[in-house]
Swiss-Prot record:
Species of origin: Streptococcus pyogenes serotype M18 (strain MGAS8232)
Organism placement in taxonomy: Bacteria, Bacillati, Bacillota, Bacilli, Lactobacillales
Catalytic activity: a [peptide](out) + ATP + H2O = a [peptide](in) + ADP + phosphate + H(+)
Record's bilayer topology term: Peripheral membrane protein
Protein name as catalogued: Oligopeptide transport ATP-binding protein OppF
Disulfide bonds: none
Main EC class the enzyme belongs to: translocase
UniProt keyword list: ATP-binding, Cell membrane, Membrane, Nucleotide-binding, Peptide transport, Protein transport, Translocase, Transport
Record-linked CDD domains: ABC_NikE_OppD_transporters (cd03257)
Amino acid sequence: MSEKLVEVKDLEISFGEGKKKFVAVKNANFFIKKGETFSLVGESGSGKTTIGRAIIGLNDTSSGQILYDGKVINGRKSKSEANELIRKIQMIFQDPAASLNERATVDYIISEGLYNFNLFKTEEERKEKIKNMMAEVGLLSEHLTRYPHEFSGGQRQRIGIARALVMNPEFVIADEPISALDVSVRAQVLNLLKRMQAEKDLTYLFIAHDLSVVRFISDRIAVIHKGVIVEVAETEELFNNPIHPYTQSLLSAVPIPDPILERQKELVVYHPDQHDYTLDKPSMVEIKPNHFVWANQAEIEKYQKEL
């Protein structure tokens, strides 16, 4: 699991030009190992979805590189290169209702990728693939003739998962796949994603703002704040030893089930102006083995004393 499947180097993503230019992501650096679940965590508007959409090619990049299996995939691509990436990289979207064609049957929605890339030889083979995928995500074959509005939110998300996985991808970007779902079905969808990963040897980029969910499913976590990745570490290391003040703030806001402990805990308030980067510029530094933090030299010395 040590092989790097995805690598992001000095990535910047901006929108607009001139005075209206807005930099959504800057200096993003991370890698995703083959077979692991790597999570991007941050508040709404932090840029996490923007990065995910850039990897799959839905957002253009301003500078930097995105590498997939050692090859640069951002920028201009030929049609054959783009098609190859679509085969290998799929996305599960946040809102299952908005991401499914309301006028199409479930059969067509899941089969669309198979049709576009000629991934079957006979109609019988296509039907068998769709039937097997429906069973794998916990849906019935009689659901194939129905339309998305006839399903619950959890069932619609399962359809979205089936649509992505029927392409037999290597890498799946899950953009807050459970945030629009009822609490009662969130665990079911998470368990489904974990099971499918184990069975199909998938690599996940899991985008979320709920740290408790991320802890359950992730191998490593990157914390992003206003377009800047401030900390990257293995899951338990990040939860047990958060270094960046913003990460500490996020973790302190996670609810504790025990009401007595919840009332006693101290919230950490993050103040962005505590960082003085006027002269001493920050960079991503490996402060501990496999634990990276965005800091300048003065902050690194301070953090190391606190370890």
